[in-house]
């Protein structure tokens, strides 16, 4: 998740050049082909990326600026750099997938750690190059339509935050995140709710979170921000709403939806969450993708044909699900470690929604909130296509309520946690805060333990990500409402927007003619909808 804006910029530049139709530029291997050659996942080759070579290519761009290269000569060097940049993240993605498939594999652990620990250098090189280009004498020529485009460098005026100190802090953060994965691998063999866990791995994880918060606060300060929250929103996630808006929104959810959450009939959920095989999970998504047709069906054909998924259970796998884009092959990959229950059908659908977005846009450059709209939106739409599954519909609506409340609680916790400083920032204070947030949001209907925040990976590896689940769920729910009222409308809106280049969430919902979750009275409307569905 490091410097999401940089990756968005890299991908955006590639897409702009694909569709620019420029005839006076020899793009060579640097541009996206119209129809990429299909490569099966098993045939993808891993080569350890070389950040030293990438930095030399970055220096060649800097030297070209100083030597007075013309636009074409300079852009040749820029694209040579981008080739190495995408090759680096291709290797990183492959190492990620292979290591997470088997956390006991020492080779892939070393490769993944290597890629993780060097990612800050790579992103720093890109950032510094773009700032240098923004300050070069031929900037206006580089912003011509056939190159970067008008106004491209507006976001790169002034000084880059990626100086030696900031890069060192980012590398330190990456090392700490790697330590969390190591501890997670150890915890996989333990009862994570036992005292043995909390006094062992759990205790180490808790202190690790304190250390991560400290490093992140230092990163924000080094970048010139007063607090980490604003830094994360603006620099990491490029959001077009503020932490203050988020906290007000979470307050509305606490007021409107927590009472409904507390009185929800949990038996409806558990009774519907029946056992489910891997084959059933696969066929659920395939059947609905085929019923939806269009880009969704095409994306599933690619996934199935090239084997771009792993939904098989293993106690050696990382206990999570995700989708990742493999840049140089122009193909996404879905990873799920299933539970053996019906929820796996929705989990696979969720990650396949990300797959569709990446497939349609050759590597999506949208913000995290918009990306989550496509994953959660496909979950809702799957209920309206293929063979009717009443149990799953009940589960999804219950899950919608759970998501609003539980993910809001998690978001509230990490927002408050990153405000703790000095003597206040301790393991004991974090445990007390998590305990209180659980009570505030009604989570104490479960066997709630303030120490259990260490079991939420996003706190450690994707800080400030969780709120994206909440705001995007609101927009995704609107797709379902459209589809129920007028069959086909929700799906059309989904398919029409899959290739969007609109990065900001509020800008996206406006362009898609959806309501903002921050609109006054919106949470009350959601409450009424859920009350009607779950009565």
Language-model segments: which ranges?
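A well-structured
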Residues: 27-279, 502
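Post-HExxH zinc-binding segment in Zn-dependent metallohydrolases
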Residues: 250, 256, 361, 366-403, ...
């Amino acid at each position: 998740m490091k410097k999401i804006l940089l990756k968005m910029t890299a991908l955006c530049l590639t897409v702009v050049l694909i569709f620019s139709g420029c005839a006076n530029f020899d793009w060579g291997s640097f541009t996206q082909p119209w129809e990429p050659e299909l490569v099966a996942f098993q045939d993808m080759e891993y080569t350890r990326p070389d950040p030293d070579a990438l930095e030399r290519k970055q220096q060649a761009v800097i030297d070209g600026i100083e030597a007075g290269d013309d636009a074409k000569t300079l852009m040749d060097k820029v694209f040579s750099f981008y080739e190495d940049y995408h090759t680096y993240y291709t290797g990183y993605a492959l190492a990620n997938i292979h290591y997470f498939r088997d956390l006991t594999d020492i080779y892939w652990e070393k490769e993944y750690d290597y890629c993780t620990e060097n990612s800050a250098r790579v992103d720093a090189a890109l950032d510094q190059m773009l700032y240098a280009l923004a300050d070069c004498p031929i900037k206006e020529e580089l912003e011509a339509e056939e190159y970067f485009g008008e106004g491209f460098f507006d976001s790169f005026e002034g000084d880059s935050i990626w100086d030696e100190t900031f890069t060192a802090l980012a590398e330190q953060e990456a090392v700490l995140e790697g330590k969390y994965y190591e501890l997670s691998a150890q915890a996989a063999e333990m009862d994570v709710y036992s005292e043995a866990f909390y006094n062992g791995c759990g205790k180490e994880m808790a202190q690790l979170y304190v250390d991560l918060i400290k490093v992140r606060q230092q990163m924000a300060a080094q970048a010139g921000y007063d607090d980490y929250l604003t830094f994360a929103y603006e620099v990491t996630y490029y959001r077009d709403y503020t932490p203050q808006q988020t906290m007000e929104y979470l307050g509305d959810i606490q007021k409107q939806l927590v009472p409904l959450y507390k009185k929800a009939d949990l038996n409806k959920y558990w009774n519907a969450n029946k056992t489910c095989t891997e084959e059933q999970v696969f066929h659920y998504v395939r059947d609905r993708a085929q019923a939806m047709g269009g880009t969704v069906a095409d994306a599933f054909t690619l996934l199935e044909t090239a084997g771009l998924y792993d939904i098989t259970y293993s106690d050696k796998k990382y206990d999570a699900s995700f989708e990742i884009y493999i840049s140089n092959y122009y193909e996404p990959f879905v990873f799920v470690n299933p539970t053996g229950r019906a929820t796996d059908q929705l989990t696979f659908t969720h990650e396949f929604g990300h797959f569709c977005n990446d497939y349609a846009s050759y590597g999506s450059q949208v913000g995290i909130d918009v990306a989550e709209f496509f994953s959660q939106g496909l979950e809702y739409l799957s209920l309206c296509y293929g063979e009717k599954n009443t149990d799953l519909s009940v589960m999804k609506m219950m899950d919608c309520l759970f998501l609003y409340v539980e993910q809001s609680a998690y978001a509230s916790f990490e927002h408050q946690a990153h405000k703790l400083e000095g003597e206040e920032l301790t393991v004991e204070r974090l445990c007390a805060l998590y305990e209180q947030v659980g009570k505030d949001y009604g989570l104490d209907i479960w066997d709630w333990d303030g120490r259990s925040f260490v079991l939420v990976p996003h706190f450690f590896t994707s800080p400030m990500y969780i709120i994206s689940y909440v705001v995007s769920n609101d927009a995704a729910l609107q797709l379902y409402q459209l589809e129920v009222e007028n069959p086909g409308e929700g799906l059309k809106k989904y398919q029409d927007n899959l290739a969007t280049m609109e990065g900001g969430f509020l800008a996206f919902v406006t362009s898609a003619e959806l309501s903002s979750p921050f609109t006054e009275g919106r949470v009350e409307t959601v409450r009424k909808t859920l009350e009607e569905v779950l009565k």
